[in-house]
């Protein structure tokens, strides 16, 4: 696991974290690798537990005097790493992402931070008691019975400790006693919401949004949307949160998925129509500090249709955060990209693309392009026992298969590596070459990259600075609203820098020169309106 000692992107060993004037986790990542016998050149089925702190923070800042925005989902579990406070723990770990990394000089890397996620009282699919005990801890309900009887459908943070009590990686240097209900407000909060407050105090123009739901917590949406009492409770819960945290000005509803199957959530053909009623009720509430409502939408055209997006826009939705990732997940034995811009329609291996989804929204649903935001990913999708039938090295369209969907290499969950893992163990962007036997391959048809090792037979589909810059250029060429990252706690800056540079923004404060990371000598890649290179006719690239 050799690394360039003078790298501008990564430390040569885990620097640890200073807590209560002590650093008891310096070198913890390396101790974890040793404990688990993790070796990137041969490991195909292990979790690495690689923390974000191994990556150096290199966010540049850029002029943002155009009509595009770059947004950031930031997760409420990203601050944790038990190795920081217990030096006996080395066989597991956490992301250890410091929210104050985003407090950059001379501007901000993101227009808006999106707190992810608020849960729902009464969601017994997520929590056996429907988050009732959490509602009591936060002072929203007097007891569990009251929570379910009178507050079902309201949104609350589902981890009070991480949301308003934690200190580590949230901008606070020591533990202070306090109950969650006492700190569940902007003035007194610690935790991630307290960290958001610190960022707000440093930059009054930085926007904040609350995202409700997500993959794991969408189980109650269908019931809420169809029930007048629960809709009212839902709106009252939003009011309560925005009163407690007036720095928030935007709302994001991440229902996965209205009218379609998500994580086994209840759904109905009436979800789309009911969703529009729910949005209208939020709009009619006229919450004083609520300036915009976005939805997180699947990039699958069938799910877009079921969500009733034109009616949602009419009811008050101002932005669509198109989840243009996870196109590849394990299941059918065929390799494909997980966040590609284009797709060859004749390719039976790939099902989705950014361009397919954007075109469907604009041409079929008549959505204003400025309301559409596309996502870039700080994580990968992987497969093992993979065989690539495209020749390597090559810039041809990806074709390949895999035969094992079990326990594939990942950082904190199987088959998913996070950005710090990539730059530490699998790709050296400063040298422009793979690490530990992996090779980076560019698919010119899809405008996407992947890593592959002949030794481990592991396939890694990922975003790179090159692919994210292409996404920025796509946004600019199509006149979309902008881009967002899932998730900002995974990126050390070079993916987000690439998004800004794809939008052709002028740099204000340079922390790092991005030029080498694009892995080409052509500073101006071909535009999509007038390609300067041969394109696959089947891809409908115009």
UniProtKB/Swiss-Prot annotation:
Organism: Yersinia entomophaga
UniProt lineage: Bacteria, Pseudomonadati, Pseudomonadota, Gammaproteobacteria, Enterobacterales
Active-site residues, as the UniProt record annotates them: 256
Regulation (activators, inhibitors): Toxin complex is secreted when grown at 25 degrees Celsius or less; at higher temperatures the proteins are present intracellularly but not secreted.
Protein name: Chitinase 1
Sequence similarity: Belongs to the glycosyl hydrolase 18 family.
E.C. number: 3.2.1.14
GO MF assignments: chitin binding; endochitinase activity
Enzyme superclass (EC): hydrolase
Catalysed transformations (reactions): Random endo-hydrolysis of N-acetyl-beta-D-glucosaminide (1->4)-beta-linkages in chitin and chitodextrins
Functional summary from the UniProt entry: Part of an orally active toxin complex (TC) with strong insecticidal effects on larvae of the Coleoptera Costelytra zealandica, Acrossidius tasmania and Adoryphorus couloni and some Lepidoptera larvae. The TC has an endochitinase activity. This subunit might aid infection by degradation of the larval peritrophic membrane.
One GO cellular component term noted in the UniProt record for this chain: extracellular region
Domain (GH18): residue spans on this chain: 68-506
Principal location listed in the UniProt entry: secreted
């Amino acid at each position: 696991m050799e690394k360039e000692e003078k790298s501008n992107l990564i430390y040569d060993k885990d620097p640890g974290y200073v807590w209560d004037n002590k650093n008891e986790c310096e070198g913890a990542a390396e101790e974890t690798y040793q404990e688990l016998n993790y070796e990137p050149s041969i490991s195909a089925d292990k979790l690495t537990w690689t923390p974000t702190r191994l990556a150096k923070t290199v966010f540049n800042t850029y002029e943002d005097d155009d009509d595009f925005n770059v947004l950031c989902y930031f997760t409420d579990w990203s601050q944790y790493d038990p190795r920081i406070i217990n030096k006996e723990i080395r066989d597991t770990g956490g992301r250890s992402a410091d929210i104050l990394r985003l407090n950059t000089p001379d501007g901000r890397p993101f227009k808006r931070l999106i707190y992810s996620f608020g849960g729902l009282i009464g969601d017994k699919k997520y929590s056996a008691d429907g988050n009732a005990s959490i509602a009591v801890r936060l002072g929203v309900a007097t007891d569990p019975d009251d929570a379910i009887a009178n507050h079902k459908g309201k949104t609350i943070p589902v981890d009070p400790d991480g949301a308003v009590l934690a200190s580590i990686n949230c901008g606070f240097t020591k533990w202070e006693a306090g109950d969650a209900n006492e700190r569940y407000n902007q003035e007194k909060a610690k935790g991630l919401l307290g960290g958001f407050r610190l960022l707000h105090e440093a930059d009054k123009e930085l926007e904040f949004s609350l995202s409700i739901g997500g993959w794991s917590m969408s189980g109650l949406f269908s019931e809420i949307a169809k029930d007048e009492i629960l809709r009212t409770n839902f709106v009252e819960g939003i009011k309560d949160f925005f009163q407690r945290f007036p720095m928030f000005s935007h709302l994001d509803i991440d229902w996965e998925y209205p009218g379609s199957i998500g994580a086994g959530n209840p759904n109905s053909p009436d979800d789309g129509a009911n969703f529009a009623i729910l949005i209208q009720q939020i709009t009619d509430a006229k919450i004083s500090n609520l300036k915009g409502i976005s939805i997180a939408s699947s990039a699958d055209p069938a799910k877009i249709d079921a969500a009733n997006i034109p009616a949602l826009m009419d009811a008050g939705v101002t932005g669509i955060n198109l989840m243009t990732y996870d196109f590849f997940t394990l299941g059918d034995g065929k390799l494909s990209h997980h966040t590609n811009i284009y797709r060859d329609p004749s390719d039976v291996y790939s099902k989705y693309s950014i361009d397919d989804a954007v075109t469907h929204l604009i041409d079929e649903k008549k959505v204003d392009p400025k309301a559409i935001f596309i996502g870039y990913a700080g994580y990968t999708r992987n497969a093992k026992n993979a065989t690539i039938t495209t020749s390597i090295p090559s810039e041809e369209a990806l074709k390949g298969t895999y035969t094992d969907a079990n326990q594939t290499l990942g950082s904190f969950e199987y088959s998913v590596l996070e950005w710090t893992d990539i730059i530490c163990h699998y790709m050296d962007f400063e040298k422009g070459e793979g690490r530990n036997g992996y090779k980076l391959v560019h698919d010119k048809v899809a405008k996407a990259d992947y890593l592959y090792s002949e030794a481990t037979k592991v396939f890694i589909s990922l975003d790179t600075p090159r692919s994210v810059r292409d996404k920025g250029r796509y946004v600019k060429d199509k006149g979309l609203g902008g881009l967002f990252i899932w998730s900002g706690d995974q990126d050390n800056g070079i993916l987000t820098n690439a998004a800004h540079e794809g939008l052709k923004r002028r740099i204000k404060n340079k922390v790092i020169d991005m030029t080498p990371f694009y892995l080409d000598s052509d500073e101006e890649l071909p535009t999509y309106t007038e390609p300067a290179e041969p394109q696959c006719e089947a891809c409908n690239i115009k």
